[in-house]
């Protein structure tokens, strides 16, 4: 697939936390914007930041040069834990997955593509009931908007298993994995990483559409160049 063909609602999820979802979201948003599409980015659940700090979605928007009005965070929980756990420890009532799905449809109206960045992996609890990204996919589909799904994964030893488990979990719920992205690729990959690059599509059962260079997460120019390369090479 060509990443610039994405439209509608696109869920960017991952095999784990800290796999590069935010930078990958920024790269995809930039590629779509450079192709002429109107893009919005949503992070429904953010944890572990003070209210005056920029969140992941704000970082993604800045890196991709997305207008601030099109960069949305719905709820923020204080401790750097799964949203369900962080909200429970803080005594917070946070929006349910059903409420979030409805709001995403409202906020996506009028945009060519809406990127929704998850938190952690696909089974991590997001709302007070412990519903996760898979439940969000279900909720959007019930509302007539089957989302595209991008899975961000690691390069290192063990990623084939984690990637396969994640993609199988998504398919077992009746959803398609459109593509996978390696969220952080080192300058000097080791033997395991080089082998993983060759084998990860088979493990995932989905195409690898991008390998994001490590350490570009603070450089908008590098993100936008990576996005250009992504659009040109597929």
Task: Identify the residue ranges that each predicted region occupies.
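N-terminal phosphate/diphosphate-binding loop that engages ATP/GTP or pyrophosphate donors
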Residues: 3-9, 23-94, 98, 103-107
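Conserved glycine(s) of the Walker
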Residues: 19-20
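Hydrophobic anchor at the start of a short beta-strand
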Residues: 38-39, 114, 147-149, 177-178
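Hydrophobic anchor at the beta1->P-loop junction of P-loop NTPases
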Residues: 12-13
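Charged helix-capping and loop-helix junction motifs
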Residues: 128-136, 164-167, 193-198
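Switch II (G3) loop of P-loop NTPases
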Residues: 99-131
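Inter-motif core of Ras-like GTPase G domains
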Residues: 127-155
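C-terminal lobe/tail of nucleotide-utilizing enzymes
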Residues: 2-3, 167-234
């Amino acid at each position: 697939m060509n990443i610039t063909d994405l439209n509608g609602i696109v869920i960017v999820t991952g095999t784990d936390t800290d796999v590069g979802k935010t930078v990958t979201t920024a790269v995809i948003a930039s590629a779509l914007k450079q192709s002429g599409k109107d893009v919005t980015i949503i992070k429904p659940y953010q944890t572990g930041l003070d209210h005056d700090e920029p969140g992941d979605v704000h970082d993604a928007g800045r890196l991709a040069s997305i207008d601030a009005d099109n960069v949305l965070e719905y709820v923020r929980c204080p401790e750097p834990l799964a949203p369900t756990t962080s909200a429970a420890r803080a005594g917070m009532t946070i929006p349910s997955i059903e409420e979030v799905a409805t709001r995403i449809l409202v906020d996506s109206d009028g945009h060519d593509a809406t990127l929704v960045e998850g938190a952690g992996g696909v089974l991590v609890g997001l709302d007070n009931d412990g519903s996760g990204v898979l439940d969000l996919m279900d909720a959007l589909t019930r509302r007539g908007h089957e989302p595209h799904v991008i899975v961000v994964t690691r390069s290192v030893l063990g990623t084939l298993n984690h990637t396969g488990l994640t993609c199988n979990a998504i398919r077992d719920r009746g959803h398609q994995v459109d593509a996978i992205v390696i969220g952080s690729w080192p300058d000097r990959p080791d033997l395991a990483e080089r082998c993983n690059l060759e084998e990860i599509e088979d493990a995932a059962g989905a195409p690898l559409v991008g390998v994001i260079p490590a350490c570009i997460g603070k450089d908008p120019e590098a993100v936008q160049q990576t996005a250009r390369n992504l659009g040109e090479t597929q």
